[in-house]
Every structure is written in C-alpha cells, then in structure tokens.
C-alpha cells in the first residue's frame, strides 16, 4: 500500500507533519469501526482493516526513518527486515568513536557535558545524513536509491545509538 497516496501526499521525504496529523484525524473519522456498528459483518471487518492501514500509514509517514524506508520500498528496495550492514569505513570509524565516548561517560569528570557533546555530535551528523538522503530520494536513478538505502541504514544506527545515550543519561539521573 502506498501511504503517500492514502494521505494524499506526493512521495517526498519532507512532508508537513501538521497536515499529516490533520489528514490522519479525517481518515480516522471516515473509517472508524464505530461508524459501521450497524452495518454487515463484512463492512465492520473492512472498517477494522482500513483503520489498521490508516494507523500504520500514519506511524510510517510521521517517522522520518520509516518514511524513507517506505519510499524505498515503493521503488522495490526493502529495508525493514534486512540485516545488511553499513560498509562506509568513515562512518564505521565515527561509530567506534561514539561507542567509546558512550562507554567513557560514567568515568567522565562532567558526565552531563559529555552527554551534551554526544547529543550535539549526533544531531550534526544526522542533519548531514538527512540532507543527503533528501537529495537521493528525489532522484530517479537506481544507483541513488541504493545510496539512499545506505543513508537509511546509517540513520537507523544513529537512532539506536541515540536511544543508548538516552538510557545512559537516565541511569545517571537515577
């Protein structure tokens, strides 16, 4: 299913999330099972299925990584359950530096400053990846779609690392 079509958006990485939320509420009202309470069992079942599609579409389009994965899946590149790793040595080196910095936080003289530095480093790198991804996803070239898939893999790693940093920060606050 093409969630961009469902929500009446052109397939683009940058979307208006406020408009997405508005269209989500409109679709929810239109397909909500309560609206079909007095209809046939088949209509009720269709309503439940449509509601699930609307919910999944909303969750997919509101999350930048899932949105990019969906765009790539529409072009025949499936990333959601893959195990392919990033081969970019520069990124792998940066990843190792971030992991070392994460491990060193607890022993740091100023753990909060170390956490803030890592958040800043993540944000800057993620912004670069997102800009590159936006350009690659607008291209019609098959090679650019494969490069976009690599950017998504990197963003997925960044999201995991960000979650780890948040857990470390939460543990220090406890």
UniProtKB/Swiss-Prot annotation:
Membrane spanning residue stretches: none
InterPro entries named among the record's database cross-references: DnaJ_domain, HscB, HscB_C_sf, HscB_oligo_C, J_dom_sf
GO cellular component: a single term: iron-sulfur cluster transfer complex
GO BP: [2Fe-2S] cluster assembly; protein complex oligomerization; protein folding
A Pfam family it matches: HSCB_C
Keyword Chaperone set for record: yes
UniProt keyword list: Chaperone
Gene Ontology MF term list: ATPase activator activity; protein-folding chaperone binding
Entry annotated with the keyword Hydrolase: no
Subunit structure and binding partners: Interacts with HscA and stimulates its ATPase activity.
UniProt function note: Co-chaperone involved in the maturation of iron-sulfur cluster-containing proteins. Seems to help targeting proteins to be folded toward HscA.
Protein name: Co-chaperone protein HscB homolog
């Amino acid at each position: 299913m093409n969630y961009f079509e469902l929500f009446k958006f052109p397939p683009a990485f940058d979307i208006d999330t406020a408009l997405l939320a508005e269209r989500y509420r409109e679709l929810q009202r239109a397909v909500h099972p309560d609206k079909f309470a007095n209809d046939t069992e088949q209509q009720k079942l269709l309503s439940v299925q449509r509601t699930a599609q609307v919910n999944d579409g909303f969750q997919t389009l509101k999350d930048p990584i899932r949105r990019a994965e969906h765009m790539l899946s529409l072009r025949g590149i499936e990333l959601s359950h893959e195990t392919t790793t990033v081969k970019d040595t520069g990124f792998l080196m940066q990843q190792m530096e971030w992991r070392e910095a994460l491990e060193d936080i607890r022993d740091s003289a100023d753990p909060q400053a170390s956490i803030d530095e890592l958040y800043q480093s993540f944000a800057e790198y993620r912004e670069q990846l997102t800009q590159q991804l936006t350009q690659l996803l607008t291209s019609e070239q098959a090679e650019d779609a494969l490069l976009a898939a690599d950017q998504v893999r990197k963003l997925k790693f960044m999201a995991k690392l960000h979650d780890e940093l948040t857990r470390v920060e939460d543990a220090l606050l406890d």
